A protein has these predicted regions:
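N-terminal helical cap/lid subdomain that shapes the substrate entry/recognition surface
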Residues: 11-109, 129
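Asp-based, Mg2+/Mn2+-dependent phosphohydrolase catalytic module
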Residues: 2-20, 112, 118-223
Length: 223
């Protein structure tokens, strides 16, 4: 499939859609919780355990992040980082940051509207440790939650989406997916035939398959 060609026009033949799947961070949930974990709580704990200042700890921790990079599974695995940095147990730290979970304003209305017409699923690159907190107030809207990291030990590749469709018992053409990462949420699912939309909240793209808000998704779905 020529993904870039398909990106130049809105997906045709949207009839027969059974499942709408959503990315989580940057799509349903703001970055606040993740920022609090990766750039506040972890450096603070590292500083305390090593007897150094917060700024120095932040610099050292971020250097370790960059050595791994976001194309490796470890990047997304909080238990890996707590072990590597000798920070103890992650769960209490995450629990203390739960108040930082924020949903985008339109999320509940969109999920409420779509849940009566489609099966809703989560297709996330976040670990289940994160999803437990991120989805705490909206999980009842979803019939299935998939974590590429925790469930399949992979990034959000075409194979991940293929396995998701198999688990849901649907063909890729019966699924719409929306998320904010061009590669993981648009290119990868599009390669197997999923009707994917790129969520661009900053409105940096003029592609028809890009949405500025989740409210715009319903325009493309059959009545």
């Amino acid at each position: 499939m020529n993904v870039m060609r398909n990106a130049s026009k809105v997906w045709p033949f949207m009839d027969g859609i059974k499942v709408v799947s959503f990315d989580v961070e940057g799509t349903l949930v703001t970055p606040d919780f993740s920022y609090a974990i990766w750039f506040e709580a972890i450096p603070r704990r590292y500083a305390q355990r090593n007897g150094i200042g917060f700024e120095q700890a932040t610099k050292l921790v971020e250097e370790e992040y960059q050595k791994v990079g976001d194309q490796r599974l470890e990047w997304y695995d909080i238990r890996y980082w707590f072990d590597k940095l000798d920070l103890g147990i992650a769960d209490p730290v995450m629990e203390r940051c739960r108040s930082r979970v924020r949903y985008y304003p339109e999320v509940r209305d969109v999920l409420s509207s779509l849940s009566g017409r489609y099966q809703l699923a989560v297709a996330s690159g976040s670990s289940r440790e994160f999803l437990r907190h991120l989805l705490r107030d909206i999980e009842p809207y979803f019939t299935s939650v998939f974590s590429s990291i925790s469930d399949y030990k992979r990034l959000k590749t075409p194979e991940f989406y293929r396995k998701m469709c198999q688990a849901l018992g649907v063909q890729p053409e019966q699924v719409v997916h929306v998320g904010d990462n061009w590669q993981f949420d648009f290119v990868a699912p599009s390669e197997i035939g999923i009707r994917a939309f790129h969520l661009d909240r900053q409105r940096q793209s003029e592609e028809p398959n890009s949405l500025a808000s989740l409210t715009h998704l319903e325009v493309h779905l059959p009545d």
